[in-house]
Curated annotation (Swiss-Prot):
Location(s) in or outside the cell: Cytoplasm
This protein's GO CC annotations: cytoplasm
Entries under Pfam families matching the protein: F420_oxidored (PF03807), P5CR_dimer (PF14748)
GO terms, molecular function: pyrroline-5-carboxylate reductase activity
Lineage, broadest ranks: Bacteria, Bacillati, Bacillota, Bacilli, Bacillales
GO biological process: L-proline biosynthetic process
UniProt KW keywords: Amino-acid biosynthesis, Cytoplasm, NADP, Oxidoreductase, Proline biosynthesis
UniProt function note: Catalyzes the reduction of 1-pyrroline-5-carboxylate (PCA) to L-proline.
Null mutant phenotype: The proG proH proI triple mutant is auxotrophic for proline.
Domain of life of the native organism: Bacteria
Class of enzymatic activity (EC top level): oxidoreductase
Pathway the protein acts in: Amino-acid biosynthesis; L-proline biosynthesis; L-proline from L-glutamate 5-semialdehyde: step 1/1
Protein name as it appears in the record: Pyrroline-5-carboxylate reductase 1
Gene: proH
């Protein structure tokens, strides 16, 4: 299920809501950038914290106009939404230190790869509403494909809050938690596949005499146009492909070469291998954390 696009205005659902990012790495920054760009939440209501890197917090403050604070300076209890964005290996200690400060009404959004809602629920022990989130790096410009999986204590109102907040970064899809690995293979890692494709488009154009930047711009606009055709027409990609493929024409020649080189199968294998690796990472975390706290899968 995908959320509807929203206009750039302050939304009533965010009235007086305060959001804190626990962790200040690249994933947190991408989400902060998307949310700030959307201009739906007052910047002063967005906070970010990390263990001790004040230089990084100052950098984010200056870049995005939000508040940065060390854990002992941030009033966790006053927040409405807590976004867990630390490294997964640090989750055990972070949850342990936050446990006594988190309030039952607070919505927890977790972008911790491989860590389930059940694990977080059991770690906090007070029927905490938890939503597992998988954005991609396009969140930085408000164009992410973001998946959410709901924990068992998430109410309909909190689901709407999560969708509205994450909708600031792009499109939001509600999936089952056991579908997170394949979503990661398609959308989490997906931007890299297209960047890889663009490398070859740019290089080939340049070798044929095009300016490097021009070749890049042409390729990027072509990818953007194809994506918009899929989204706006609702047509099956095969139909759109057939519509521009004349017998013995240029597109047919290009597609034949692509198929001969294993293009379609390569794409399929890339997604499958990324999904497999996502599952392996989850299992590695399980081996480490399960004896301590419970359920990760």
């Amino acid at each position: 299920m995908r959320t509807k696009k929203r206009t750039k205005e302050m939304l009533p659902i965010f009235d007086q809501k305060k959001v804190a990012f626990i962790g200040a790495g690249s994933m947190a920054e991408g989400m902060i950038s998307g949310i700030v760009r959307a201009n739906k939440i007052p910047k002063q209501n967005i906070c970010v914290t990390n263990r001790s890197n004040t230089e990084r917090l100052t950098e984010l403050e200056l870049q995005y106009g939000i508040k940065g604070a060390l854990p002992n300076q941030l009033c966790i209890e006053d927040m409405d939404v807590l976004i867990l964005a630390m490294k997964p290996k640090d989750a055990e200690n972070a949850l342990s230190s936050l446990k006594s400060r988190i309030q039952p009404h607070q919505l927890i959004l977790s972008v911790l790869a491989g860590i389930t809602t059940s694990f977080i629920e059991q770690s906090l022990l007070n029927e905490q509403p938890v939503v597992r989130v998988m954005p991609n790096t396009s969140s930085m410009i408000g164009a992410s494909a973001t998946a959410i999986a709901l924990g068992k204590y998430v109410s309909e109102d909190l689901k709407k809050l999560a969708e509205a907040l994450l909708g600031c970064m792009g499109e939001v899809y509600t999936i089952q938690e056991n579908q997170m690995d394949i979503f990661t293979g398609i959308a989490g890692s997906g931007p890299a596949y297209f960047y890889y494709l663009m490398e070859f488009i740019e290089k080939t154009g340049e070798e044929a005499g095009l300016d490097k930047q021009l070749s890049r711009s042409i390729g990027a606009q072509t990818l953007l146009g194809a994506a918009k055709m899929l989204m706006e027409t609702g047509e099956h990609p095969e139909i759109l492909r057939d519509n521009i493929t004349s017998p013995n024409g240029t597109t047919a020649a290009g597609l034949q070469a692509l198929k001969k080189s294993g293009g379609g199968e390569a794409i399929s294998q890339a997604i499958k291998h990324a999904a497999k690796r996502s599952k392996e990472i989850s299992e590695d975390i399980e081996k480490t954390a399960a004896p301590l706290s419970g359920v990760i899968k």
